[in-house]
């Protein structure tokens, strides 16, 4: 047993994409700061950031229909889509800066150009997609998008999906070539390799057991060294909790007022993966459909080309499951252990409100392989059962909180930074769009936790991320310049997406 306190400037909990991004930003902005990372698993990027544990979509709202909603008058609200796209551009710029500065290399190992497509069936959905296309096409971030409801065009765009299709039901698709497939596991590992060269102390198989405030205002982190069995105590001026689903229980241990009245609802994900390489080669896009009526946003079905271990793969899903674990490697007691006196009413209210979600999850858990194949055949009519296996993806913990708009126990579907009033500690909660917006979210952490430093840091931030603080929607020329330059640096030689 060791009770010796070891001091440092910054502690990052969890070796996923969020800690990797924050650590990389801080090492560029304050290179003299000492940083320690604690990760329970044996290496970086093994939980939610791992390439098999998420969809690998560079979420920029090019194809995800849940980011555009239909108003009562039939018009399309694109505000959320624009926001998500703007946020992804920040990630793209930062990654390009890292590559150009030779801090990370071989961008093709973590990002590949890939068309993003939306596909719908039925007259009403075709009309919705056309209206969506027309609304987005007016925005410079989405120029280059094509729409078609012509069967011959759809056969060219989607040969695997259109082959063997017998229904005469109207279909339509949009296609944009500037989409990406991102291997967040590979990117996370690259970033931590870079941080290691900057003397960041990486501690794997180190589990954080407790976090408490010391009398002198520092944070003391109690760590179990799983290699030696020893208990260590580390103190820091600033702590970031980036432990994916494991962040909520650690945030609760801090006791900060901002951690109260927040709950978490774990949802597990399953994907079907194609093991017939001949089928894999017939598809080249991320194709997102429309969630069924009454299904939650997380259930949007998609058929994705992926690049994993430098090999082309084909995945379909997600299918939801239920597990009380907050992490894939977590405990069955995670959910019950997160219920506290200050959030029990919030959790109970959510339970009453979300009966539809509960019913949906139960139905999903009960699905047989053949029932899942039936859902896949809505995308690929000729899909054969023997060509597809199931892969268990990561756990996502949806935030439950009390809101003015939704009332007590409202389920949240985004990511959220929770920080202490004095900015000394912050945690990231939630799920989608997640890793794609890591740079935007970590800039938010910097703004919340280091407000007095932002003026000093602004010049360097803009060197790394030129559109920081600027709306690209309102600056189409800047968007075109940045899109072209980052595309060149990252090896994304897609068609030019902005037309004059």
Curated annotation (Swiss-Prot):
NCBIfam families: mal_quin_oxido, PRK05257.1-1, PRK05257.1-3, PRK05257.1-4, PRK05257.2-1, PRK05257.2-4, PRK05257.3-1, PRK05257.3-2. Its cofactor is FAD. PANTHER family: L-2-HYDROXYGLUTARATE DEHYDROGENASE, MITOCHONDRIAL. One of its GO terms (biological process) is tricarboxylic acid cycle. Pfam families: Mqo (PF06039). It catalyses: (S)-malate + a quinone = a quinol + oxaloacetate. Pathway: Carbohydrate metabolism; tricarboxylic acid cycle; oxaloacetate from (S)-malate (quinone route): step 1/1. Its EC number is 1.1.5.4. It comes from the Bacteria. Transmembrane segments: none annotated. InterPro entries: FAD/NAD-bd_sf, MQO. Keywords: FAD, Flavoprotein, Oxidoreductase, Tricarboxylic acid cycle. This is Probable malate:quinone oxidoreductase.
